[in-house]
């Protein structure tokens, strides 16, 4: 698949990568229909976020179609059009239960395009799908 990845400060590239796969029962694989580039992505490319590793696919927002779901994804099905949140959340930890999703204690928060591969690609793996995706309105056009 095609993906736009960070290389090093001042450098990013469009490249070919392997399509992501389900690695946790709460994951979903989304075929990206629309994605965004925002100031945060530009800060990453500039080198302002040193924790972003070389070859990380950028992007943390998008709209897509679910192609595959893990066994413990209950709120979505294959074929659903979804909005991908910029914040991933487990929905179960202390902070998630209080609605403070950015502080998820179980590997959530701002991770897409930051700590894991993001949405500026043909496909993305979204962790904690039940809490990190939203059903798109049925009248939303591609």
Residues of each region from the PLM?
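Extreme N-terminal starter segment of soluble prokaryotic enzymes
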Residues: 1-2
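Residue-level signal for short segments within beta-strands and strand-turn junctions
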Residues: 5-7, 46, 66, 97
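Short Gly/Pro-enriched turn/cap motifs at secondary-structure boundaries
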Residues: 7, 19-20, 53-59, 111-117, ...
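Residue-level recognition of beta-strand termini and adjacent short loop/turns
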Residues: 8-10, 24
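Short glycine/threonine/proline-enriched tight-turn/helix- or strand-capping micro-motif at secondary-structure
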Residues: 11-19
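Glycine-rich beta-strand-centered segment in the early N-terminal region that forms part
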Residues: 20-35, 48-94, 137-139
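Cytochrome P450 core scaffold surrounding the K-helix E-X-X-R motif
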Residues: 40-46
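NAD(P)H dinucleotide-binding glycine-rich loop of Rossmann-like/cofactor-binding domains
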Residues: 92-142
């Amino acid at each position: 698949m095609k993906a736009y990845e960070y290389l090093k400060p001042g450098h990013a590239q469009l490249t070919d990568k392997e399509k992501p796969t389900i690695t946790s029962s709460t994951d979903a694989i989304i075929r990206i229909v629309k994605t965004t580039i925002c100031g945060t992505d530009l800060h990453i490319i500039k080198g302002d976020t040193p924790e972003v590793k070389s070859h990380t696919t950028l992007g943390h927002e998008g709209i897509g179609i679910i192609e595959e779901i893990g066994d413990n994804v209950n709120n979505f099905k294959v074929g659903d059009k979804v909005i991908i949140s910029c914040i991933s959340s487990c929905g179960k930890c202390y902070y998630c239960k209080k609605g403070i999703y950015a502080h998820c204690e179980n590997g959530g928060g701002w991770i897409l395009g930051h700590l894991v591969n993001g949405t500026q690609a043909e496909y993305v793996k979204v962790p904690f799908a039940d809490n990190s995706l939203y059903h798109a309105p049925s009248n939303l056009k591609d």
